Amino acid sequence: MLLRSGSKYIITAEAREEIKKRNGKLVTIDEMVEVSKSTQLDSVGDVTTTNLRRAGAKLFLQIVDLKTKRGESIFQHEEGSITVRNDPGTISFDLIEAIKSSIENNKPTRIEVIGEEDLAVLPIIYYSKNNTVIAYGIPDVGMAALTVTDDLRDHVTEVIAKMAIE
């Protein structure tokens, strides 16, 4: 994901359609707690992250924006978190770098996003090793998960190629 400082990827209609082709499987909290015992588990979204933590899941990456789907700020900042800006419908250079650094340095990290974290799943897939599991929330539905494979990473590369760069 080559991007220069200050730049960002912007979702396009074509990229959004490509994303829809690979939805994760609906999962339960208990399933994800079990997964976290033997596999790297990352979470995207405040409700997903909070529920997994309360249930005792071991999380490597936690990416949150401290808001609910309605925009209410009901979640709290945690000391030691990395804070990055990421506008809705985009993937910022700073978000990519925070994810990449955490994965490359094998350092569990909580990233608090000012803006929106929804598209963070893409750079997580791009940089994660195979078999990493990423849990994320689907509003009004539940929680879904994707397992990183070479095929999924190739799909993400195609999605990114269809995004605009600003």
Curated annotation (Swiss-Prot):
Its EC number is 2.7.1.237. Pfam families: DUF359. Pathway: Cofactor biosynthesis; coenzyme A biosynthesis. One of its GO terms (biological process) is coenzyme A biosynthetic process. GTP binds at D46, V47, D65, K67, E117, D140. Keywords: Coenzyme A biosynthesis, GTP-binding, Kinase, Nucleotide-binding, Transferase. InterPro entries: GTP-dep_dephospho-CoA_kin. It catalyses: 3'-dephospho-CoA + GTP = GDP + CoA + H(+). The keyword Repeat does not apply. The keyword Hydrolase does not apply. One of its GO terms (molecular function) is kinase activity. Belongs to the GTP-dependent DPCK family. Catalyzes the GTP-dependent phosphorylation of the 3'-hydroxyl group of dephosphocoenzyme A to form coenzyme A (CoA). This is GTP-dependent dephospho-CoA kinase. It comes from Thermoplasma volcanium (strain ATCC 51530 / DSM 4299 / JCM 9571 / NBRC 15438 / GSS1). The lineage of its organism: Archaea, Methanobacteriati, Thermoplasmatota, Thermoplasmata, Thermoplasmatales.
